[in-house]
Structure formats: structure tokens, C-alpha cells
Amino acid sequence: EPLACYGRWRDALQLDEALLLVDFSLSTPWLGQMQQISLTAIYCVCDNSVRVAVTDQLLVADTSLSPQAQYLDWVSAHQLVDADPQAPLRLATQTIDKPWGQEIWYTAVERRGVCNFVAGKAATPIPWLQAVLPGAVAGEPGQPLVLLKILDPSPQPVLGDLYFELHEAKREAYVVTGINRQAWPDGIGYIRYGFDPLKIASCPSPEAFRQEYLNAVTAYERQRRLLDTLTAEGKTPSSAQVATERQLREHMDSYTAMRPVQKSDVVRVPVLLPHALQHGVRVIEFQTPSYERKIVSFAQKVLTQDHWDSQEAVVSMLLEPPAEPAPVHRPSPEGITIEQIVDFPDFEVERVTMVRGARWLPGASSTYRLLIVLEGELTLAGVVYAAEQAVLVPSQWQGELLASQAAPSLAFLLARPNC
């Protein structure tokens, strides 16, 4: 274990400058099998401070160099992130194509992609650095970070509508950052969010509503699969078949509720509530770092699984969302507004607004924090972050956040796990 080796070495260390290498194996459960990769942790102590790097590459020592010079040589030669456990770590983005548009990942670790910490041209996978950083300042080794991503649907109706799905354990929160005016000329977009109260009331019981809705979904799924099969065979569906698909889809969707949203709105998605972001609505999303879901319906061919989960989902789904809590305003210095906009059992999110030139000392935290800029420019530890750029703030960091003089105001989101 690299951290245990580092702890024993550091306790016994009597030199002002020293270098420790630890070869270890890291499990990679995100690949779906209990595979392991061989890595080397590099710890460099100089003047009572430590720098950390990790690599899967062979390291060749130059005996003419001092420990610190050797460390910096390896970092440069192999393009490794040089991590100070007390300093913020920039998050790289990774774009994933979806049937409905694209996702932009910041902290995901899964088979489809592993996100990185970055510094200049250097990049290190998040779980690698978590495994070697002392004090769990970037989260516990082996534990995923709160999931941060952008959802960017196509502006085209139907094509850009996401899966109507629910989660049994995962909670999600969206902050709307843009409404495509091509899709929504008045600047008001939508998310499919639960079910129509009038439709529910028109049924003799909630159970009767569930069955009626399931019948509509089943009829649509049958027609959807027919069209998908014809397309896969290189055949063109007839106009009558396409018209039937549209009629069945509109009937199925008539049972659901459409919630209007505009820029800056916050949408909290509790467990078991079916939801589907609609075309042309761009959001920043924080969510529980798990990947389970049940697909209730989708107006395209589902590529990630060979079935819908409608039958099972309809039994347990919430029909209507719980009451929306109001944002909690937290004490803050002049020129700064802090709102707690999400308070889930597993994570919370604050929205912070700072006037031009304002400075804020947030203080240390018991956990890491994820920060993503909404608008304006933020200077943090000497690095400037613009809109949709993100950084992990380690738990013990106590530096200053500065709003740029160049923009009228700064707004960013700050998330932390509740643990």
C-alpha cells in the first residue's frame, strides 16, 4: 500500500530532501473485472513539504541529480501531474457522444472513459492520484468522486430528448446553463418530470394509472422496435408506420408532466422519479457516483441495453415529485452571495456569486470540494478558471478565491460529499 509505505517512511525520515518510490498494484473495478494495473508512486520531500506523482511508466534514475531534481526530471519527462496535497487539482474534460447529443465528463471513472487531473500538458487518471495522495485530500482511495458532468442535448425535437428513466439509488441535480433559442425561441425549455396530476386524478386509483400508463408504453415500445428492426435491415419504414409511431409516442407522453426551465434554474431529481431532459436544454449535473438506472421509455433505439425496464419501473416509480425546498442563504462577506441549492443525503451543492474583484476565503473542509465556474473568471491558487472549467479543491486547502476584474460578476458551483 503506497500510503502506508509513505507514512512509515515519513515518520522515520531525518533528511531535509528525499525521494521514495513505491511499486504497487491498483484494482480497476470500473473495467468490469477485477483487473489490476502496476503503478509507481513517487514521493518527494523537500523542506518539510511533499510533492506526489504516480505513473505506469518505467523510471530510470540519474544518480547525478538531487532527489528534488530527479523528481522534477521524471515529472517533466513522463508528463506527470505534480501534486501538492494542499493545492487544488484541475479537472480535464472528456466528451462522450450520446444518441441524443453529448455528455462532457469531469470526474467519471468507468469503462467508457476515465477522467484525469491535469496540469499543463500533464495528465493523471483520477483514481491513480487518489491512491497515493496522503490524507485522502482528494477523496478516499478507491472511492469515486461526486459525479460532475455537462449534459448537452441536440436542439432537434425527439432526437435531443433524453431517456425517460428513474434511479433507485442515484440522486441528480441539474443547473440550467443554456437554452437553445433554435429549439425554444422564448428561452424557456423543458424537462419531462413525473406525471400529469390531471391524468392521475382521472384514474380510479394510482394502481390503475400505473397500469394504463404501462399499456401505453408497451404499445409504443412494440412500434419503436418495429421501426428499429426495419432500419437495421436497411429498409425504410412506411409513412403509415412512422405516423403510428408518432401517435403512440404522443399518447404515451400525454401521461407525463413537462416542467418548464430557464437559465439558472435548479432541478433536483430524487430517487424513483422518472425524468428526461428535453432537447436544447444544456445543464451542469451533479449526481451520486453510481450508474444504475431503469429506462421507462425512449423515442430512439436504446444502444446501451437490449431491453426497456418499463414493467419493473412502473411498480416503484414516484408519480409526482416531492415539494421543492427553497435555497438556503448562508452567511457571507459583503459582495458575496452563498446559496445552498442542493442538500441530498450523499452530497450538497452551493451556488456562489461574487461581484467584480471580490475575494473569499472559504476555509478548510472535512472533505474535498468540486468547483465549476458558471460565468465570469475565477482565480484560484494562481490559476484562472473560466465558464465550464472545473477544479477539485482538497479538504485542507485554505487559500483565497478571487473574482476577476474583467467580468461584471463571477458565479460558480461548489459541491461536496455528505459523509
Please name every model-derived segment.
Residues 19-21, 266, 272-274, 282, ...:
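Residue-level marker of beta-strand positions
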Residues 386, 406-410:
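Compact beta-rich and alpha/beta scaffold cores in large eukaryotic transport/transcription complexes
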Residues 181, 274, 291, 377-378, ...:
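Short, glycine-/Ser/Thr-/acidic-enriched flexible segments
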Residues 179, 270-272, 286, 395-396, ...:
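Fold-independent oxyanion-binding glycine-rich loops
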Residues 371-372, 389-396, 413-416:
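Active-site pocket scaffolds in enzymes
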Residues 256-268, 379-402:
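Short acidic-glycine-tyrosine-enriched beta hairpin
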Residues 274-279, 284-287, 360-362, 380-381, ...:
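Short beta-strand His + acidic residue motifs that chelate non-heme Fe in jelly-roll/DSBH
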Residues 1-263, 278-375, 414:
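Active-site region of the double-stranded beta-helix
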